[in-house]
Amino acid sequence: DGMVIDLEHLSNEAEQIKEKGISVTPDNLKLSKHATISMPWHKVQDELEENRLSATGSAFGSTRRGIAYAYSDKYRKKTLRLADLLHLDNENVKARLKTILDAKNLELAGCYHQEPMSYPALLSWCEKQADIFRDYICDTGIFLNNALADNKKVVLEAQLGAMRDIDYGIFPYTSSSSTIAAYGPLGAGIPYAPLNHIVGVLKAYSTCVGAGPFVAENAMSEEWQKLLRKYGGEYGAATGRP
């Protein structure tokens, strides 16, 4: 429920999995209707703002995948959720999409001098995503609660450490969501489910990518840093940065 989803990236991942002979169907992949959509302008904004900050030496080291901007628009209520894709023929949904785009075009034009995005093109993009994912969208909270009622085991997986948590991490050099275990049930739509086991995965040494303070980096020589990167494969999964 609490995720933001890059549907184009998800579609590409699903195709890669299928190419390896693994089926991807609504039976083994379910998307929460409450999840927030990463819209086409989110990556554009991320790229433009990171370039602007880089010019002054104050960039955050963003992956430029639009994550922060998707979460920002989620809390500003200026984006769509997956459930909206199921009702694109509804005039209220269309009107809301148009209103959101009008506001976003003002931001892009006023802050970054960009040409406005087209509403027909945006609606077409939404319709394409709806065609691909319609059968996968459901109330995952009900699905998981039913599984718990049947005494089935539910595993919640997340990434990033506590220091990247938006509330408890090294703000502002954090992710844009909560990374701690306690948020797991809430984000999954099962807020009252107890966490019976918490498993933390640690490496022998700490690493991080992006800008911001990192004590361990200052404690070792540049030669050691290069060795760890080389033999540990310490490069960002999304960007390839050291």
Model-based region annotation:
Residues D1-P242:
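Non-transmembrane, aqueous-exposed alpha-helical and coiled segments at domain scale
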